[in-house]
Amino acid sequence: MVKARRQAKILELVRTRVIETQEELAAALAAEGIPVTQATISRDIKELQLTKVPMPDGRYRYALPEEPGAAAGERWRRIFREAVLTIDHSGNLVVIKSLPGTAQGVAAAIDHAGWPEMIGTVAGDDTVIVVVKPADATGEVAERLKGLMR
């Protein structure tokens, strides 16, 4: 595999999953059909300037270099605070209403939070749907998201 493609896949994995160790990253790459050695992973992490940031539960995960030290950086919190109008939930879904044209930015902010209970977001023009797993965590996730509005 070409180095650039492998590193692009690493960035995608770190952006979309909670990766806590080099071993987890290697396993995720292998599952995508990209076998790598620990030495290669280590070099890629250094070249991509990935860092480890704390999660709300005290564990650490790999993060992209533009993410400040917290799982949801101040830039993302500001976008969230300025754009979100309401947050509600039902079943395993959290529905977020935002200013027209801002849902994509709100969804990106949520995705950057890296909370393991949130398995994905779907954004329209002014609405974001967050899919939560397990369903009984939906209320807690909605409250945590409301906390970002403050």
Swiss-Prot record:
Record's keyword terms, sorted: Amino-acid biosynthesis, Arginine biosynthesis, Cytoplasm, DNA-binding, Repressor, Transcription, Transcription regulation
InterPro entries: Arg_repress (IPR001669), Arg_repress_C (IPR020899), Arg_repress_C_sf (IPR036251), Arg_repress_DNA-bd (IPR020900), WH-like_DNA-bd_sf (IPR036388), WH_DNA-bd_sf (IPR036390)
SUPFAM superfamilies (UniProt xref): C-terminal domain of arginine repressor, Winged helix' DNA-binding domain
Compartment(s) where it occurs, according to its Swiss-Prot or TrEMBL record: Cytoplasm
Entries under Pfam families matching the protein: Arg_repressor, Arg_repressor_C
Predominant localisation class: cytoplasm
Entry GO MF terms: arginine binding; DNA binding; DNA-binding transcription factor activity
Protein name: Arginine repressor
Biological source species: Symbiobacterium thermophilum (strain DSM 24528 / JCM 14929 / IAM 14863 / T)
